[in-house]
Every structure is written in C-alpha cells, then in structure tokens.
C-alpha cells in the first residue's frame, strides 16, 4: 500500500 508496487507479488 506504499511505494510503486510494493504490495504486488513481483
């Protein structure tokens, strides 16, 4: 929920 795609798998 922060950074660019930190909560994304890759």
From Swiss-Prot:
Contains 8 disulfide bonds. Keywords: Calcium channel impairing toxin, Disulfide bond, Ion channel impairing toxin, Neurotoxin, Secreted, Toxin. GO terms for molecular function: calcium channel regulator activity; toxin activity. Signal peptide: none annotated. One of its GO terms (cellular component) is extracellular region. Expressed by the venom gland. It is found in: Secreted. Blocks contraction of smooth muscle elicited by high potassium-induced depolarization, but does not block caffeine-stimulated contraction. May target voltage-gated calcium channels on smooth muscle. Belongs to the CRISP family. This is Cysteine-rich venom protein. The lineage of its organism: Eukaryota, Metazoa, Chordata, Craniata, Vertebrata.
